[in-house]
Amino acid sequence: MLMEDGGLDTTSEEYRKLSKAERRKRRRATPKYRNLHATRERIRVESFNMAFSQLRALLPTLPVEKKLSKIEILRFSIAYISFLDNLLQ
């Protein structure tokens, strides 16, 4: 039985009677679902990258223009937080 979004109702009796290969074939996402998922993923990645940019802007590194990888940003952040913590103690 098809659902409103064009996908197959996996709880239906019709679906359970299909072989494993047929079920796998029918479970493929519809183009509409794939587009929605791609859009959500793109927004998630943009948000993630924006957070890294904001974190990068707070790090005192020289030169400021130097491009850092995400792992470098995280490692420098850890080191900087440790440094600031030591200053307070």
Swiss-Prot record:
Matching Pfam families: HLH
Disruption phenotype: RNAi-mediated knockdown extends mean lifespan and reduces expression of bcat-1 by >50%.
Principal location: nucleus
Tissue: Expressed in sensory head neurons of the lateral ganglion.
Region feature (Disordered): 1-32
Record's GO cellular component terms: nucleus
Chain segments carrying region Helix-loop-helix motif: 46-84
GO BP terms: determination of adult lifespan; positive regulation of DNA-templated transcription; regulation of transcription by RNA polymerase II
Keywords, comma-separated and alphabetical: DNA-binding, Nucleus, Transcription, Transcription regulation
Stretches for region Basic motif: 32-45
Annotated ranges, domain bHLH: 32-84
Keyword Transcription regulation: yes
Biological role: Transcription factor which binds the E box motif 5'-CA[TC][AG]TG-3'. Involved in modulating physiological aging, probably by regulating expression of branched-chain amino acid transferase-1, bcat-1.
Protein name (database record): Helix-loop-helix protein 15
